[in-house]
């Protein structure tokens, strides 16, 4: 496999990608550049540097991408009120296009002719990484070891690591109970007991949130300030995008918000059960719909809702860098010009309740909407003609004998 001289590897420092690093060196006889992304996963990323150095890697990239992640990926997604299959807030999906982008940037900077990732051949991530890579660098070679090697169990990986002197932490022979992925938007949990769709998840699994039952008995109130569809302040204090999300995770988690247990349809064809912890995102979704409720035109809001499932599917299936997603994003962003104002929320035992919203760009007119005397602002007699015109097609059909009874 002499055609590959240098590979950029998406490297976490864990067992899988450490084995991949050594496997690439031996199988392709190539130089490996490692790239470790800090997306707010809450783990120290610097140990990955020491591991890579110990394995002979000379070019090591460890990048703090938290602000870019929230500003350029999470926030644009939430402008669309994006939810996949009615529940999933796409915490894993939205991180992959940024990682793919950075892999390609590093490949260009280092003269690498290939990239590699640790996604398995059963999951969505292989598709997300590779669609992004090919969109950004059409001629790049992608090496996906899980589709090539025979190391198809954790024990085989451990044995390979020990045989090749790869530093690992072996805790007996017991398999880790969950496969986890974390970033500033969420933590996902898969595998283990969760593979039985009838078995309830364990309370000890959750890392960011208390159970709703153990959340404080006193409600927490917060105010979120929006500018062009993005949160710019919490309780009147301006914050950067990453800090906004981190603070909402902390506040939401303390109130038992953001837990989810679902079975989703993977792009590769199978159903998969996952548990997700997304406290900040859960708050953001509720708040964004609230500020839009007073600032968006009715038909614009309805059109956004119609297009949202397609937009969500594009993100879930790895088409972030596609022309259709970019086209939808331009439309979504155009709709956010007047999405400005403040939303007040009540957080209590797993629930997020909107209790107030205000905006200088509000389309809500109390003089027209009032149940009291409106001083002629709205002529109720006009409704008769409106109703008759909208009933015309149904009246014609009924007169032609098309009875519905």
Curated annotation (Swiss-Prot):
One GO term (biological process): urea cycle
Binding site for ATP: 10-18, 37, 118
Disulfide bond sites: none
Pfam family, one: Arginosuc_syn_C
The organism's place on the tree of life at top rank: Bacteria
Pathway, per record: Amino-acid biosynthesis; L-arginine biosynthesis; L-arginine from L-ornithine and carbamoyl phosphate: step 2/3
Residues annotated for L-aspartate binding in this entry: 120, 124-125
Compartments in which it is found: Cytoplasm
Keyword terms, alphabetized: Amino-acid biosynthesis, Arginine biosynthesis, ATP-binding, Cytoplasm, Ligase, Nucleotide-binding
A GO MF label: ATP binding
Enzyme class: ligase
Signal peptide: none
Subunit and interaction comment: Homotetramer.
Protein name, as recorded: Argininosuccinate synthase
Organism, scientific name: Pseudomonas putida (strain GB-1)
Gene behind this protein: argG
């Amino acid at each position: 496999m002499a055609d590959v001289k240098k590979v950029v590897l998406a490297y976490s420092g864990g067992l899988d990608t450490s084995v991949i690093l050594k496997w690439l060196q031996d199988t392709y006889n190539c130089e490996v550049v490692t790239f470790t992304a800090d997306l707010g996963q809450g783990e120290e990323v610097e140990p990955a540097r020491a591991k890579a150095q110990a394995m002979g890697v000379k070019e090591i990239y460890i990048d703090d991408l938290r602000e870019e992640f929230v500003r350029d990926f999470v926030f644009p997604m939430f402008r669309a009120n994006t939810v996949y299959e009615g529940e999933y807030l796409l915490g894993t999906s939205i991180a992959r296009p940024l990682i793919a982008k950075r892999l390609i940037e590093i490949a260009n900077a280092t003269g690498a002719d290939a990239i590699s990732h640790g996604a398995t051949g059963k999951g969505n991530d292989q598709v997300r990484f590779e669609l992004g890579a090919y969109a950004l660098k059409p001629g790049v070679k992608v090496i996906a070891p899980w589709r090539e090697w025979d190391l198809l169990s954790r024990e085989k990986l451990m044995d390979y690591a020990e045989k090749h002197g790869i530093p690992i932490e072996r805790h007996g022979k017991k398999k880790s109970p969950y496969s986890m992925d974390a970033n500033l938007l969420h933590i996902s949990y898969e595998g283990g007991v969760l593979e039985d769709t009838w078995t309830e998840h364990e309370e000890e699994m959750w890392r960011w949130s208390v159970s709703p039952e153990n959340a404080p008995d006193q409600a927490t109130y917060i105010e979120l300030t929006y500018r062009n569809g993005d949160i710019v302040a919490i309780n009147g204090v301006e914050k950067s995008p990453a800090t906004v999300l981190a603070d909402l995770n902390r506040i939401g988690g303390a109130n038992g918000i953001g837990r989810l247990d679902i079975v989703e349809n993977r792009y590769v064809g199978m159903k998969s059960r996952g548990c997700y912890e997304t406290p900040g995102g859960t708050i953001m979704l509720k708040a964004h719909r609230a500020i839009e409720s007073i600032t968006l035109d009715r038909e614009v809001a309805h059109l956004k809702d119609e297009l949202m499932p397609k937009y969500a599917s594009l993100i879930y299936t790895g088409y972030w860098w596609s022309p259709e997603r970019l086209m939808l994003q331009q439309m979504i962003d155009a709709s956010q010009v007047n999405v400005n104002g403040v939303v007040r929320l009540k957080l209590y035992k797993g629930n997020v309740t909107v209790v107030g919203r205000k905006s200088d760009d509000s389309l809500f007119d109390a003089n027209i909407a009032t149940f009291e005397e409106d001083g002629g602002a709205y002529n109720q007699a006009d409704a008769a003609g409106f109703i008759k015109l909208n009933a015309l097609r149904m009246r014609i059909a009924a007169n032609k004998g098309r009875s519905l009874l």
